UniProtKB/Swiss-Prot annotation:
Gene Ontology MF term list: peptidyl-prolyl cis-trans isomerase activity; protein folding chaperone; ribosome binding
EC number(s) on file: 5.2.1.8
Keyword Transport tagged: no
Protein name as annotated: Trigger factor
Amino acid sequence: MKSSVEKLSATRTKLTIEVPFEELKPEFDKAYATLAQQVNMPGFRKGKVPAKILEARLGRGVVLDQVINEMLPSRYSQAVEENDVKALGQPEIEIAELEDGKHITFTAEVDVRPEIEVPDFSAISVEVAPLKADDEAIDAELKNLQARFGTLKPADRAVKKGDFVSIDLSATIDGETVDEATTEGLSHEVGNDSLIEGLDDALVGMKEGEESTFTSKLVAGEHADEEAEVTVKLGSVKERELPELDDDFAQLASEFDTLDELKESLKGQVEQQLKNTQAGEIRDKVLAEALEQTEFELPEGVVKEQVDAQIQQIIQQFGGDEKVFESMLAAQDMTREKFEEDARSSAEDSVRTQLFLDAVADKEQPEVSQEELMDHIAFTANQYGMDPNQFIMQLQQAGQLGSLFADVRRGKALALNIARTSVKDTDGADVDPKEYFGDVEAEGDKADKAETDKAEEKPKKAPAKKSTTKKSTAKKSTAKKSTAKKSTAKKSTAKKSTTKKATKSTAKKSTAKKTTAKKAAEKKED
């Protein structure tokens, strides 16, 4: 086999591949075997029809088509590897020449990674918010904990903010009932504005058994963002009775004996949360600055695929009905063109970030251990509420394990470079990025999760260790996840809070074009 490469642009390459017939015996054997299974001929068992008889029956062209389809993926992959082509997505393939008995020549155009010059991260300086665990933040955490241990008691009075109510809801548009907006016995905390605009205002002042009607936009379903007449009927009213904030409460809600000890632990948790936030801010600002200093073209096929994926994902949310999608856009006074423009902007940002992080990883060449990969898989599985083992099986079936490996590799490479930057807070104090992202010289740095969830359990007496966590990607708005928000910081060593669960808690429980030309290769080349 012979192959050559022609650079069409910074992000597009054309391969020309010539395969002599003497190399195609395995493909011919497989083609004959496949076709023999599809033909029934008197005097021959199924699958045992000789090659010459098959050609006489089906025609030489059918056999050659089968051979070409068998040959294209492997020969294309071989040419990509031999020529060190950094291909993205599937190629567009055309048969350029076919001389039966001599050779087959085909071309493959494919998007490729552009050449990217990674900037000097040691020259990057960013400014972030300072760490201030003030009394107000600590009191807010204490009140949240107190609310979790509150009890609900019936209130024989008009509704006020902070009450918990049971309500029936119904809605009409132009006199027609909206079935999907009808519900009974719905529990709701008045004042949290979690349901529909105008509901809390309507509820305040109502008494049990009363009804009120107001106008609001529906927030979901087929009539999302449409104006509707909403009727709410109040079933019951309950108020939350909070426990006294004293030593007894500390013993009830935590492992501590005194309220002062509990407050000290909560202070540590607030500081931990602030550190997590600061680590995420450092990462985002450093990455944004590095991208600002780097210019490169984007492969159009990759961008287009992400745009199409975003649109198809949203349409699927409406049951695959494109008319409903169009109605949703109309209700928001948005045209299809404007939506696609916004989707393209998002896709370009995603592709630009991923390609840049790939370039950083190629430059740093960080090693990814099995433990690091498994940690990342477990974290991602948790984000989807899945069992890690089940998640791994799905990844293997979809051939996506390599994608998560690449995520960890990008994260480690970026973490190493963030550690080289200069960081100050807005008060002028130096911030050491190594505290979050590890030492530049330490190849064993962990690239794990960002932004640890708030502690939901009982605080331990041991103070929380310093956070080294980082931000996670979770956008689901696109079919292909952006790696812009992948983890880059060291694995958190902060101990989990062990706050007791309240038994009477009142807390409310979118890579490349898939258009292949004639007899295109069906294997994707990453």
